[in-house]
UniProtKB/Swiss-Prot annotation:
Entry binding sites for a 1,2-diacyl-sn-glycero-3-phospho-(1'-sn-glycerol): R136
Originating organism: Ligilactobacillus salivarius (strain UCC118)
Protein name per the record: Phosphatidylglycerol--prolipoprotein diacylglyceryl transferase
Top-level division of the source organism's lineage: Bacteria
Xref: NCBIfam families: lgt (TIGR00544)
Length: 269
């Protein structure tokens, strides 16, 4: 931490190599998510090794897809800087791209391992949103994914800790801590999903992950509107369009599945 109170994004320097807080936080979030998924997976007769293998396959694909998603919607820049398209360490990944990549891997993985897809998605959904909430603190360390400019007075009115206020002071301007808004929303979503999942005869198979989509996309739509660094598509940001589509689709899927399959089993069965 420097004399202005801004946290150094580099946690440890080993010669020419840097270990950044962002990586530490993301890795910790993934480890916690895997641990909790293993515990829940045992209740649903999913082998521990299946969870570990899924992570091994899905993580690199998710990272690649997150980068591709970002580059595609910033093609006006990267079309003139092709050599930078792979420089992921310079920043520029999108969570929705990562989720799309992970879902593709899950669909293939479940088919090959003969695992019920909806069951596996229900198992990991709450831990994914928890990891997302924790991961936003990596953005905090990098002073990125913040919102529009604001005032010191406004930040103080939120009764935020001083270290958060200091970190939101970037190049002479204070910014909205949208990372914090999303982190709190995601962690709250984790709690809600766990409570709902534990209720008997409340959620059908597949409705835990659909509830995750509804919760996350609803919050992301509004929080994304406060961002200044996200990708635009017309009058809305790309993530807002996708959030809107996912929100409506998940609600429709719940009604469609219940209407067309009255024998659909409860998650707790």
């Amino acid at each position: 931490m420097n004399f202005l109170g801004v946290i150094n994004p580099v946690a440890l320097q080993l010669g020419p190599f840097q270990i950044r807080w962002y990586g530490i936080i993301i890795a910790s979030a993934v480890i916690l998510a895997v641990y909790l998924s293993v515990l829940e997976g045992r209740k649903q007769n999913i082998l521990d090794d299946d969870i570990y293998d899924l992570l091994l396959y899905s993580l690199p694909v998710a990272i690649i897809c997150a980068r591709i998603y970002y580059v595609v919607f910033e093609w006006s820049y990267y079309s003139h800087h092709l050599s930078e398209t792979y420089r992921i360490w310079d920043g520029g990944i999108a969570i929705y791209g990562a989720l799309i990549g992970a879902v593709i891997v899950i669909l293939i993985f479940c088919r090959r391992r003969n695992i019920p897809t909806w069951t596996l998605l229900d198992v990991i959904a709450p831990t994914v949103i928890l990891a997302q909430g924790i991961g936003r603190w990596g953005n905090f360390m990098n002073q990125e994914a913040h919102g529009v400019a604001t005032t010191l007075g406004f930040l103080k009115s939120l009764h935020l800790p001083k270290f958060i206020i200091n970190q939101m002071y970037i190049d002479g301007t204070y910014y909205q801590p949208t990372f914090l808004y999303e982190s709190l929303w995601d962690i709250s979503g984790f709690v809600v999903l766990i409570i709902l999942r534990r209720q008997k005869k409340l959620l059908k198979s597949g409705e835990v992950v659909l509830s995750y989509i509804i919760w996350y996309s609803f919050g992301r739509f509004f929080i994304e509107g406060m961002r200044t660094d996200s990708l635009m598509l017309g009058s809305l940001r790309v993530s807002q369009w996708l959030s809107l589509i996912l929100f409506i689709s998940a609600i429709a899927a719940i009604f469609y599945r219940r209407y067309n399959d009255p024998l659909l089993k409860w998650y707790t069965e």
